[in-house]
Amino acid sequence: ESGEHESRQAQCIARWPMSGAFDLLAEQTHQCPFNLMLPFETPITQLNCHYNHTQVWLHTHLDIDWAIDAHDNDALAIYPSPPMQAVITALEQCGLSLYSADVERGQLRGGHFQSTIGCYQELEFRPNAWLSNLNELEVSFVTTAQQTHVLFEVDRKMRGDHYQTLSLPHTPIDIASLTAHLKQLLGL
């Protein structure tokens, strides 16, 4: 998604050169062991929601003259980190349901933090019936090595949007305390 226009297109979030040049004869195999660290902001793919439009894959490309199939895409399963999962669980305990997830092109800015990979993920939560003054809540995470920043876009009926931010350390989080804090912070 970009502005008001929705489309699907790939967004490269990192590149890693894997191997130098080598010769490969017919019927010969070549192994190239590797280990890599995904960017902290890699979008989550493993979410329990109605519409998950998030896909992350490892795209491999070999520079082979006249190759029939020199490309490959291997899907990756990206799970929420413990702070992300704590926020999702706390919002569910506040009476919200995770409805959809997508990735938007651009940079996310929230007070003292900003995204760095050229895109950011939005998780859309919708209220259960008893939270009738809320249209939706959009949540985006910007994770660093030290903490996870959260940007909340609160869309209220008849009152428009407003934003709140929260930063969580990468230490165990008490869900009951976080739930109470989010209720107050977001006016739930």
Ranges and model annotations:
Residues 6-48:
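A beta-strand/beta-hairpin structural motif
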Residues 35-39, 61-63, 79, 142, ...:
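Solvent-exposed residues in well-ordered beta-strands and their adjoining turns
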Residues 107-188:
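C-terminal interaction module
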Residues 89-115:
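Compositionally biased low-complexity segments at domain edges in trafficked proteins
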Residues 29-33, 71-73, 136:
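Intrinsic-disorder/low-complexity, polar/charged segments enriched in Ser/Thr/Lys/Arg/Asp/Glu/Gln
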Residues 1-9, 158-159:
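Short aromatic-acidic-glycine turn motif
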Residues 35-41, 48-67:
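Internal, hydrophobic beta-strand segments that form the core of beta-sheet-rich folds
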Residues 65-92:
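Short beta-strand elements
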